[in-house]
Amino acid sequence: MADPRQEFDTMEDHAGDYTLLQDQEGDMDHGLKESPPQPPADDGAEEPGSETSDAKSTPTAEDVTAPLVDERAPDKQAAAQPHTEIPEGITAEEAGIGDTPNQEDQAAGHVTQGRREGQAPDLGTSDWTRQQVSSMSGAPLLPQGLREATCQPSGTRPEDIEKSHPASELLRRGPPQKEGWGQDRLGSEEEVDEDLTVDESSQDSPPSQASLTPGRAAPQAGSGSVCGETASVPGLPTEGSVPLPADFFSKVSAETQASQPEGPGTGPMEEGHEAAPEFTFHVEIKASTPKEQDLEGATVVGVPGEEQKAQTQGPSVGKGTKEASLQEPPGKQPAAGLPGRPVSRVPQLKARVASKDRTGNDEKKAKTSTPSCAKAPSHRPCLSPTRPTLGSSDPLIKPSSPAVSPEPATSPKHVSSVTPRNGSPGTKQMKLKGADGKTGAKIATPRGAASPAQKGTSNATRIPAKTTPSPKTPPGSGEPPKSGERSGYSSPGSPGTPGSRSRTPSLPTPPTREPKKVAVVRTPPKSPSASKSRLQTAPVPMPDLKNVRSKIGSTENLKHQPGGGKVQIINKKLDLSNVQSKCGSKDNIKHVPGGGSVQIVYKPVDLSKVTSKCGSLGNIHHKPGGGQVEVKSEKLDFKDRVQSKIGSLDNITHVPGGGNKKIETHKLTFRENAKAKTDHGAEIVYKSPVVSGDTSPRHLSNVSSTGSIDMVDSPQLATLADEVSASLAKQGL
C-alpha cells in the first residue's frame, strides 16, 4: 500500500489540481479518503475494474478498519452521526465539519500529506471549493464542526456500507452508468469511509496517519467544504451537477431509509437528507467525473458537489444511501463493479441503466448514484458516455487507481484531470510506454502497493469498455502502461485532463497514507508523428564531389579571397589641362567672385534720339493738366433747321386744350334715316342737334307719328327717345 501512497504523493505533484478537484467534487472527502484500499466486498464481487479491490488485497489499517466500520453498523453510525444530523440550514463549515479532521479528511490525509508537502494551496482550494460549493448549492452552510460531523458520518456511513458490502461494492462500482468510474468511485467512497473510519478509530495510529490528520485538517477543511457544499445543497446539485429528477431523491431517500433503518441515526439522517441518495450518487459521480473537469472546473461539478452535499447532509444520509446501496448493491455492484464490464463511460451509462433494471432499489440507488453519474456526464465530458477512448478520464483513472480503486470514483476524476485526453491511440500507446517507464514513479502503479495484476484486472475490465486504442490488459496482466494511461499521466484519451488527476488515484489507495512522494515522471503524450520523426534514415553513400563542378560559393571557391588578390584598381589621373571647366569647375577654384579681371560693363543707352510714347520716358517731365491742351465743346443748334414732330422738343411749350388749336368732333347721325325693324306705328325722327350755345345740343323738332308729340314740349319723351336711340345704336341698328 505504501507504493500506492507514494504514487499518490507523486500524484500530489498534481495535488494542487487534484486537491481542487477533490474539494470541488468531494473527492477530498471521498476520493482521497476513499482512495484507501476498499475492503473486498462481502458479496465477493470485488471490482476487477476498480483498483480498489487490488489495493484492498493488501490489508491496510483502513481495510481492517473498514469491516469494523461496517460492524459499527447502525449503532455506530448513529453514534458517529450525532454530527450527521445537522440542520439542513447549517452548512458543513458552520457545523465545523471542515475544521475537525473527518474520517474522510483522514482518508484524504494521504492526499493531505502530499498536499501539505507541496499542495498547501490545495487546502485553500478546498476551502474555496467548499465556499463555492456552498454558495453554488445555495443551501445553508453548516458550521465547520457540523461539516466535520457530516463528513465523519459519511465515514460512518461507509462503515454501514462496509456492513453491507453489497452497498459498498455498489458504491465502489458507482452508478451502473459509470461502471469503471462509478465502481471506482463507490469503492473510493467505501475506502474513503474506511479511511475515515481508520482515521477515526486510529487517528492516533501510524504517525503517517497522525501527521496526515493535521495536513488533512486542511484537506478536511476541503472535505468539510465538500461536505459543506453537499450540505449546502442537500437537494440541489452543485454547479456542474446535472439536476436529478424531482422524484429521484425521494426514491433514493426511500431506499436509503429502508436500508438505513439498520442504524438508529439512519432514519433521521435520511429524513434530514433525502439527498442521501445524492450522497451515494455524488460518490459515484465523482468516480465517474473526470479529474480533468474537477481540476479544470475548480468549482465542484454537480456530482462532486452532490457527493459533498450527501456527506454534509449527514453521514447518516450517506449511511442510509450506502445501506440502501448495500441492499441494492448486489445488482448494482455487479453492474458497476463487474470486472468484465468495460470501463468506458458509455458502458458505465449502460451499467447504470442495467443496475436500475436489475432492482428497484438498484434503480433508486442508480438514480442516487447514477443520476449523479448522469449529472456528471452531462456536465463532464469525461463521463463514459462522453469519452469511450482510453484517454477518457475514467479509463485513465481506473487503471491508475488499482490501489486507488478504493477511491475509484474520486480518483477517476482526479486521474482524468491529471490525464490529458488525447484521442490518438498512438499517443495512448506512447503514454503506456511512458507509463511503463514511469511505473516505479507513478504510472505503473499510482499505488505501488497495488499489484500490476490487480491494476491490470481493473484496467482490463475498464479498458474494453473504454474502447481505448491501447491494448487491454487481462485481469491478471496488470499492465502498468494502462494504469499509466488511465492514471492520466500522459494518456491522450483524457482531453484536457490535467496530469494531477492520475496522481489522485494513487493517493487514496494506500491505507497507510504514507506521504511518500514518488517523483512524478510526466511523459507528454507521444504522438506517432513524434516517433516517426525520431526514426533515422538509412545511411546514404556520400556523392562524389570531386567531379562535380561547384557553383559560386561552393568548395572550389573556398580559396577565393573576396575583394583581394589579383584584382587591382588603378586610379589614373586625367589630364584636365585642355579641358575647359564649367562655371564653378576646378578651373574656377581660384576665381574670386566679384574681383579680378572679370568686369561687368554697363553701357548707358543714348535715348536722345528716341521719341517716347505717351507715358514713356520722354514724357516723364510732362505735367498733366497744364499746357496747351484745350478741350472744346461745341453745341449744335438744331432748332433752327429741324421741325419737331408732335410731342417733340418744339411742342414742349404747347398747352393742351389751349391755344388756337381746336379739336373737332363729327358725329354721324344715321338714325335720322333709320327705321325701326318693327313698325310700332310711330316714327321717331331724330334730328341731330344743332350745335349752338343757346340751345341744347340735342333738339327734337318733331316726332312724326300718329298723334305726334312735340319732343320739345315733352322733355321726358325726348329723354326717352334718346335712351332708345342709344340702345339701338349699341345693338347696331
From Swiss-Prot:
PROSITE patterns in the record: TAU_MAP_1 (PS00229), TAU_MAP_2 (PS51491)
User: Which residues are recorded with the post-translational modification Phosphoserine?
Assistant: 35, 50, 188, 451, 470, 477, 483, 487, 490-491, 494, 506, 527, 529, 531, 554, 577, 581, 585, 597, 616, 644, 648, 688, 692, 696, 701, 708, 714
Entry membrane topology? Peripheral membrane protein
* Domain of life, per lineage: Eukaryota
Q: Which residues carry this modification: Phosphotyrosine?
A: Y18, Y489, Y686
Q: Where is the composition biased (Polar residues)?
A: 50-60, 126-137, 203-212, 413-427, 693-708
Xref: Pfam families: Tubulin-binding
| Residues listed as glycosylation sites in the UniProt record | S692
Q: Which UniProt keywords apply?
A: Acetylation, Cell membrane, Cell projection, Cytoplasm, Cytoskeleton, Disulfide bond, Glycoprotein, Isopeptide bond, Membrane, Methylation, Microtubule, Phosphoprotein, Repeat, Secreted, Ubl conjugation
Which InterPro entries does this chain map to? Answer: MAP2/MAP4/Tau (IPR027324), MAP_tubulin-bd_rpt (IPR001084), Tau (IPR002955)
Q: Name one GO biological process term.
A: regulation of cellular response to heat
Which residues are recorded with the post-translational modification Phosphothreonine? T58, T60, T100, T445, T461, T467, T468, T473, T497, T504, T509, T523, T695, T719
The biased composition feature labelled Acidic residues covers 189-202
Q: In which tissues is it expressed?
A: Expressed in neurons and at a lower level in the liver and kidney. Isoform PNS-tau is expressed in the peripheral nervous system while the others are expressed in the central nervous system.
Q: Which residues carry this modification: Omega-N-methylarginine?
A: R115, R447, R641
From the Swiss-Prot or TrEMBL record, state where the protein is found.
Cytoplasm, Cytosol; Cell membrane; Cytoplasm, Cytoskeleton; Cell projection, Axon
This one is known as Microtubule-associated protein tau
Native organism is Mus musculus
Q: Which gene encodes it?
A: Mapt
